[in-house]
């Protein structure tokens, strides 16, 4: 669960209608991971395999990589379980915002994952 204002980490990740799936693509665990890996490698080329593994574990624990995961105890929603995310937010946007949040708050996934292991949230 994430508790900082959305605008702090969505400032540079604006809604882009091109993110919405226009064809038969179904966002599932595999397509979400594939997209996240591509975005992570493009935006953070120095992050290696360990950072990817940490991200897989972190979001696996938070949502099982389910773009429709809904936390009944908070406003957290989606793959990254970001607070105040509207239901129906496209999976690519969830992933981009989740990575932006991790960079903003923790610098990289391994630190976010360590925090999650200690506190049960990130």
Predicted regions and their residues:
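Cell-wall glycan-active module
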Residues: 1-38
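Peptidoglycan cell-wall recognition and remodeling modules
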Residues: 26-122
């Amino acid at each position: 669960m994430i508790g900082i204002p959305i605008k702090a980490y969505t400032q540079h990740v604006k809604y882009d209608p091109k993110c919405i799936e226009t064809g038969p693509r179904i966002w599932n665990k595999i397509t979400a991971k594939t997209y996240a890996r591509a975005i992570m490698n493009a935006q953070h080329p120095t992050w290696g395999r360990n950072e990817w593994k940490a991200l897989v574990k972190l979001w696996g624990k938070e949502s099982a990589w389910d773009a429709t995961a809904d936390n009944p105890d908070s406003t957290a929603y989606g793959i990254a379980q970001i607070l105040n995310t509207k239901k129906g937010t496209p999976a690519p946007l969830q992933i981009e915002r989740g990575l932006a949040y991790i960079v903003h708050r923790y610098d990289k996934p391994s630190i976010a994952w360590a925090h999650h292991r200690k506190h049960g949230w990130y």
